[in-house]
Swiss-Prot record:
A motif (Nuclear localization signal) lies at residues 2-9. The lineage of its organism: Viruses, Monodnaviria, Shotokuvirae, Cressdnaviricota, Arfiviricetes. It is found in: Host nucleus; Virion. GO terms for cellular component: host cell nucleus; virion component. Its main location: host cell. Residues 1-51 are annotated as: Disordered. Self-assembles to form the virion icosahedral capsid. Keywords: Host nucleus, Virion. The keyword Mitochondrion does not apply. Residues 1-41 have a biased composition (Basic residues). It comes from the Viruses. This is Capsid protein.
Length: 395
């Protein structure tokens, strides 16, 4: 059988068969020029310097008056180079008195000599109408010359301490019900009080209901209480109410009104030239009320009250207290804490104990802004813990 294909000649060289794809490519070409690439921008996270430990401790106390931070209570805003941080406290039992409407009125305010007055307490004596809880061994005033001079007379109110300047760092109150489960009925309501505290609503009087005119404190008097006790609270945007048995879940804290916390300068004495409105001398009822719209009254008020903070008013609706049997009222344990920053003159003995204040103004401004934003809500009268929510209006 004849072969179908002729035998390939050996003299002709065999070439490799190219694929159709390879045939279309040119045998030689110039190298492709790459387009210039843009420089790659690498994002670098900013490196934050760690905050000074002393400043962090001070901010912890500024945010929470009950903080267990080991540092001194100071505001790290750079307004004081050297100062002393002081923490003063009051622990007392509150009980609604047998005669009355079974309501305890607790008012917290940013004061130097004391920070809480209670209306309707069983410890009221005489006709004063309220109980004053002053800080023990902390900034009292000798008003004996004014007491002896009488109403409208001249006299000196002298300081018993050597504090030159002061300002409030933080202040708060905790309340705990001491009654048993069978006697824990009752409720409370509270609001923030941001109105300007007028000077004529304050007075010098003896603290802790003691009869003394040489060591008085400065705080709200009965005139201020008479206008507040009957005020309708429910329409306030900061209104909060709750069961009395859950009051220990709340921390009532004064909030800053601005980021400016200026020091209050305290003179050694005030000369009250016709600046005394009322002088009542009757046992524990001793008090000196200042006249309204006088230079002395405004000077004293501006020096002893830090108006950069607001106030808190708590109205507690207690059990009936008949004084006998099972109706013995509502007993509450009050724990008040006031953190203050103090400055002394060079000639005072306390001056050598002053320490350098920390500086963290940016962190302080941020903490202050967050605190002021949080107080807008009605439930921010204090920190609500353990899942207990307040009875508040819907937003």
């Amino acid at each position: 059988m004849a072969r179908k294909y002729a035998k390939r000649s050996k003299s002709r060289p065999r070439t490799a068969r190219r694929s159709p794809k390879s045939r279309s490519r040119p045998r030689s070409r110039a190298p492709r020029r790459k387009a210039p690439s843009r420089p790659r921008i690498q994002r670098v996270n900013p490196v934050r310097r760690p905050m000074n430990s002393t400043a962090a401790q001070s901010l912890a106390i500024y945010r929470n008056p009950f903080s267990h931070s080991p540092g001194q209570p100071k505001i790290p805003d750079g307004k004081a180079i050297m100062s002393i941080g002081s923490k003063v406290q009051v622990s007392a039992q509150l009980l609604n008195k047998a005669s009355g409407d079974d309501i305890l009125h607790v008012f917290l305010y940013p004061g130097l000599t004391q920070g809480m007055v209670v209306f309707g307490d069983s410890k009221e004596q005489g006709t004063r109408g309220f109980t004053a809880y002053g800080y023990n061994d902390h900034m009292t005033y000798d008003a004996s010359s004014v007491y002896n001079a009488g109403t409208g007379a001249d006299g000196n109110i002298e300081s018993n301490d050597n504090i030159n300047e002061w300002r409030l760092v933080s202040q708060g109150l905790k309340l705990s019900l001491l009654n048993t489960d069978e006697e824990n009925d009752g409720w409370f309501e509270c609001v923030r009080y941001k109105d300007a505290l007028r000077a004529n609503e304050f007075a010098f009087y003896s603290g802790d209901n003691l009869e003394q005119t040489t060591a008085t404190v400065f705080g709200p008097d009965i005139t201020f209480g008479s206008t507040l006790l009957t005020k309708n609270l429910v329409n306030s945007p900061t209104y909060v109410s709750g069961a009395l048995e859950d009051i220990d879940k709340y921390e009532f804290k004064l909030q800053a009104q601005s980021e400016q916390h200026d020091f209050k300068r305290i003179p050694d004495r005030w000369y009250t030239e016709h600046g005394v409105d009322t002088v009542t001398v009757s046992g524990v009822n001793d008090y000196v009320t200042l006249q309204a719209d006088t230079a002395q009254a405004h000077s004293i008020h501006n020096s002893l009250v830090d108006d950069s903070f607001d106030a808190v008013y708590i109205r507690i609706h207690c059990r009936t207290n008949s004084g006998a049997g099972a109706t013995t009222g509502s007993k509450l344990l009050a724990h008040l804490v006031s953190n203050q920053e103090l400055v002394y003159d060079e000639d005072q003995n306390e001056h050598k104990f002053m320490t350098q204040a920390a500086m963290a103004k940016a962190e302080f401004m941020k903490a202050n802004e967050m605190a002021r934003k949080s107080q807008v809500g009605a439930d921010m009268i204090g920190n609500v813990r353990s899942g207990v929510r307040s009875q508040r209006r819907p937003r």
